[in-house]
C-alpha cells in the first residue's frame, strides 16, 4: 500500500487529494458566481452575503487542503505533475482576495451600514468581479 508522509496522504487506503479537490472545484466557482451577483445587487448581498462569506471561507480552506494533499499525493505518483503542482501552489493566493472582498461587500451592503461612499462601493464591486473571475480561471486551470 502506498502511503505518503504527513496528514494529507492517505485515508483508508485512498489518496486524500482526489477527494479533497472536489470541494474546491465545486465551491470556488459557486462562491465566485455568488460574489459576482453580490457586486451588482446589494439586496442579494444583504440577504445572502453571510452565506456566500461562509461558503467562501470553506472554499478557501478546501483550496488550501487540496494544495497540501496534492503535495503529499505527488510523492506517491511516478509521473510528472509539475504544472499542476505549480498552479496548486498559487491557487490559495488567488482565491484569498475574493474572500476578503466578499466580506467587505457584505459589510457595505448590510442594512444601516455607512461603510464606503459610492466610489469605494463601485471600486469594491469591480475588484470583486476581477477577483471572482481570477478565481474561476485558476480553479479551471489547476
What residue spans do the PLM features occupy?
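Polytopic transmembrane helical bundles with strong interfacial aromatic enrichment
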Residues: 1-142
